[in-house]
Amino acid sequence: MVEEPTIAVYDSQSHEYHRAFQVFLDHTDQKLKAQKWLTDLIDRLPSRRVFIDAGAGNGKVTAWFTERFGRTITIEPNASLRSELKRDCPAAEVVPERILDAKVGAAGDLILCSHVFYYIDASEWLPNLQRLVSWLSSSGVLVLVVQNHDTDCMRMLEHFFGRRFLLASFARQFQKGCGESYQVRVETVPAQVETADFASAYTIAEFMLNLLPISDPPARGALEEYVGAHFARPQGSFRFSCDQDFVQIWRRG
């Protein structure tokens, strides 16, 4: 009996991950909308001395904002991503550690943690969040960026693995648990993936499923059927939502 092919499984250090991520970037407005939202926030900051990018990846997002701050500190444990980070952000200080192990030695006016919590086990969300807010300056803001739980992508994740990411709800629980020492605000910004061909839509869907560790990958045919049934448009293109939550946390005055 021939086994049915399964979806590809890869980690964030692999060539396959980077290739699929680029296909995603080429077919979404998510990053441009994030850039605009963050630019508007930075314009309103009372101080722009220190920018901390926790989980900076390859530095593409970091590079948008380094010139807006007097000092930029990046945290990135992935060696392959760090090489790109150093190339694209030569003026930034690079801390090659996980968030929980990092020592930054500065208070951040903006601390950004963008699409990182997917890769952190839920049991470690609280200590990671506590570490991040401990780096805030008195007037600083922490921004956690994560895909909204009610997008087409998250519904697909729940369909195949029974899970969605509920970071915004977790942040509100954190606020209550801290005796209201922190203010939390969540803003959802719509975003879409749109492709003209099935192959790109499938690659992006497969990439989204790889946000979680996959011990028992679903059949490739099952994902192909899902993409066709849920994301296909009448004119032959494919569209699915990937709205972002911008979770803002700052100290109460």
Regions flagged by a language model, labelled:
Residues 1-46, 48-57, 141-168:
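Conserved class I S-adenosyl-L-methionine
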